[in-house]
């Protein structure tokens, strides 16, 4: 009998690519199924993700997957909490503009989350230091 060698990394990459191409992660507004919204904490963009991030996100990811399997149209966005003095201080320490420092960290964290197989709706990603995002926060506070 021939021995079969499994390559988990290749299998994972294959299916993640297919699921993303099929739009499995994305909820459509015109979908007639019952809608379910789920949000996890937004990681702070101070550097690499660590086990504490995934410890907090894994239950949300599992619940969103479960609801998809139950037939719900699940909105499960991700975002990055990107404002704060620690990010600015780290950027200054590394001689990098704070916005570049933050966006580089966002890119790295996005890649890490995708590698872990998180099933977020990447089309609904929010970065809190993006003017297109925080203009709505400012608008809301002005309305209070």
Predicted ranges, named:
Residues 1-144:
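N-terminal, positively charged nucleic-acid-binding surface of large information/translation enzymes
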């Amino acid at each position: 009998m021939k021995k079969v060698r499994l390559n988990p990394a290749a299998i994972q990459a294959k299916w993640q690519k297919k699921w993303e191409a099929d739009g499995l992660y994305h909820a459509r507004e015109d979908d007639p199924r019952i809608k379910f919204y789920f949000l996890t904490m937004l990681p702070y963009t101070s550097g690499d993700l660590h086990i504490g991030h995934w410890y907090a996100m894994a239950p949300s990811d599992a619940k969103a997957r479960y609801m998809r399997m139950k037939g719900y149209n699940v909105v499960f966005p991700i975002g990055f909490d990107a404002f704060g003095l620690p990010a600015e201080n780290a950027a200054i320490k590394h001689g990098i503009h704070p916005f570049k420092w933050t966006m580089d960290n966002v890119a790295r964290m996005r890649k890490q989350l995708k590698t872990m197989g998180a099933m977020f709706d990447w089309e609904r990603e929010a970065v809190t230091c993006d003017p297109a995002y925080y203009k709505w926060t400012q608008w809301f506070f002005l309305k209070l």
